[in-house]
UniProtKB/Swiss-Prot annotation:
<dbReference type="GO" id="GO:0005739">
    <property type="term" value="C:mitochondrion"/>
</dbReference>
<protein>
    <recommendedName>
        <fullName>Large ribosomal subunit protein bL12m</fullName>
    </recommendedName>
</protein>
<comment type="subunit">
    <text>Component of the mitochondrial large ribosomal subunit (mt-LSU). Mature yeast 74S mitochondrial ribosomes consist of a small (37S) and a large (54S) subunit. The 37S small subunit contains a 15S ribosomal RNA (15S mt-rRNA) and at least 32 different proteins. The 54S large subunit contains a 21S rRNA (21S mt-rRNA) and at least 45 different proteins.</text>
</comment>
<dbReference type="GO" id="GO:0003729">
    <property type="term" value="F:mRNA binding"/>
</dbReference>
<dbReference type="GO" id="GO:0032543">
    <property type="term" value="P:mitochondrial translation"/>
</dbReference>
<dbReference type="InterPro" id="IPR000206">
    <property type="entry name" value="Ribosomal_bL12"/>
</dbReference>
<keyword id="KW-0687">Ribonucleoprotein</keyword>
<dbReference type="InterPro" id="IPR008932">
    <property type="entry name" value="Ribosomal_bL12_oligo"/>
</dbReference>
<dbReference type="Pfam" id="PF00542">
    <property type="entry name" value="Ribosomal_L12"/>
</dbReference>
<dbReference type="GO" id="GO:0005762">
    <property type="term" value="C:mitochondrial large ribosomal subunit"/>
</dbReference>
<comment type="similarity">
    <text>Belongs to the bacterial ribosomal protein bL12 family.</text>
</comment>
<dbReference type="GO" id="GO:0003735">
    <property type="term" value="F:structural constituent of ribosome"/>
</dbReference>
<keyword id="KW-0809">Transit peptide</keyword>
<dbReference type="InterPro" id="IPR014719">
    <property type="entry name" value="Ribosomal_bL12_C/ClpS-like"/>
</dbReference>
<dbReference type="InterPro" id="IPR013823">
    <property type="entry name" value="Ribosomal_bL12_C"/>
</dbReference>
<keyword id="KW-0496">Mitochondrion</keyword>
<comment type="function">
    <text>Component of the mitochondrial ribosome (mitoribosome), a dedicated translation machinery responsible for the synthesis of mitochondrial genome-encoded proteins, including at least some of the essential transmembrane subunits of the mitochondrial respiratory chain. The mitoribosomes are attached to the mitochondrial inner membrane and translation products are cotranslationally integrated into the membrane.</text>
</comment>
Amino acid sequence: MFRIASRQTRNLRALSSSKNWARSLVNTRSFRAAASVQNNNAQIGEMVDKISSLSLLETSELVKQLKEKLNIAEIAPMAAVAPAVASAAPSEEKAPEEKKEEKTTWNLKLESFDAGSKAKVIKEVKSLLGLSLVDAKKFVESAPKVLKENILKEDAEAIKSKLEKLSCKVVLE
């Protein structure tokens, strides 16, 4: 900052001592830079005025031509979704050739139960989920409801077989 101030002071001293101070002022570097900035700002201001007077269709055409001239690629509005959609299409074609990955985690859903075995179902749900008797009763009565989420297939099948023995309808999702 000190250098800038001393340079400006030097320029002012040179101007005040010279007879043709106007010519000296125009020849200083800082004045030329300021003049070019003003010219650029004037040009930009004119462009802004012209662009703002364009209609929506004309603006769209302007954007299209600028993209072509500057070699700007089209970008999808949801860039994260576009690659996923693009990669999903080829995999559907290869699906018959490749084996589908087997689901590793399952959700166990209690669909319905026999009213005669309600007490046994409540006890089983109480022990499976670690709920109090009242909470287990409310859970069973609010069926259909997800019993357990993200459990292994073997565990889900074991629980399903226990509940089916109590005449419950259980679904693996």
